[in-house]
Structure formats: C-alpha cells, structure tokens
C-alpha cells in the first residue's frame, strides 16, 4: 500500500552507511524522535533498542530541530568530527566512552528494560520527567555496559519571531501531489 519500507529510517541509513562509510548521518523527524531510546514497537510486539544503534546513524536531532540542526551544520562546517558533537541540546549520540557522559540521569540498561515491564515504565517516567526544555536533564541508556546512548536536554523552543519566520516560508499547505489520482 505505502511506498516506504517498514523501518524506513533504519533501511535508508544502512544503505547510506554501506555506500558512504564515513559520511556523517544525522536523522530526525517523527520516526527518529519517538525511537531515540529503547521503545515498544507495535509491529514486532517487542521492546526495541534505540534507532541510533540499528540505523548506524551518528546523531539524532529530536523534537523540533530548527535550532539543533543549524548547530550541527555549523559544527560540521567548523571541522568538528561528527563523533565529537556531543554538546548540542535536542540531540542524541552514542558512545563507548562512559567518561564522555556528565551531569546525566542513568536509565535502566536496555537488557533490563526489554525483560522487565517495571523497568521499562521507570525508564519512560524518567524520560517523561525530562521533556521540558528549561528543566530537562541529560539522560543515558546503557547497552550491556559497553555502549551508551545519550540524550542531551531538549532544545529551547523557537521565539515568536523565529516561529513567524518558519511559518512565513512558502509551504504548499496541501497534501503531497503523489496522492493525486491519475
């Protein structure tokens, strides 16, 4: 029915990574934002790990990414390696170096989350309590003690002027033309 593969972000990122091995891959949008940490997947009826690990992407820009994507682009343009971009609010990164994680709330390990509903609920509660852009804290989710997925605090919201600029862009304000009947 649809034209996208299931788990489109994972499929497309892995194809990009296979072809362009060292190209930075930054993902965003609804699929990446909702799957940035361990999450329940209705299609497979399982708790799945962060999309960052399954996709092979380097960073997630979650939520409203207008600020974070510009900061990421500026950092890359300044010559900062994508693996060193660990400081931008509204992003998620992965690391094997526990020392890179500071001032953060530890979530239950993925193996514990996928086996224990209470641990999953506790993890979700900590995530929920840290969604406010003014008081949200950095979170990290261990994967077997060797890999860590780190969610930086949420990005600050757009100002009224910035919001007006976004909505003044020439959007079609209509559904995509591919849905037109032939």
Residue ranges and their predicted role:
Residues 124-182:
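N-terminal [4Fe-4S]-dependent radical SAM core
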